[in-house]
Amino acid sequence: MRIFRKTILVLTAILLSGVGATHLRAQTRAAVSGTPEALVADLYRAQKSKRGPFFQTRSRALVDKYFEKGLGDLIWKDARTSKGEVGVIDGDPLYDAQDMEIKHFAIGKSRMEEGRALVDATFENFGEKKTITYILVKGAAGWRIRDIVYAEGRTLKSEFKDAR
């Protein structure tokens, strides 16, 4: 009986320490995911695993997870109205390219400017160095992407405006 009780106590202690460690990892993940650069990194991960918000019509919530309403509306409308054909977004908007051979990919630390966070994604595509800047704003649901800035000041929003 004593051995049984000790075994139960030891197992309970092990279980509780595991729960505590899991809780700590979850808190750390939540804290990291609350940053602008974490949202951008998650967007790239989702797109790489073919579960990104672009070119899909299954889930508006997936678009809203990453983008502020204005840009989200444009992305969603483009996906829905293009019906599997090429829409306004005619390449991968995360790399500003149709063909990709990505090397030296990095997401920089966010910097604040005029109440917005700016996050740079840098990489080489077929040997050409590129920087794409994400403009994020913080709302009730956390950080969301307001626009994406490409070379020479062209933006994802401007692509939609030019297509009208």
Question: What is each of the regions a protein language model found here?
Answer:
Residues 80, 112-116, 120, 125-129, ...:
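Low-complexity, intrinsically disordered terminal/linker segments enriched in charged
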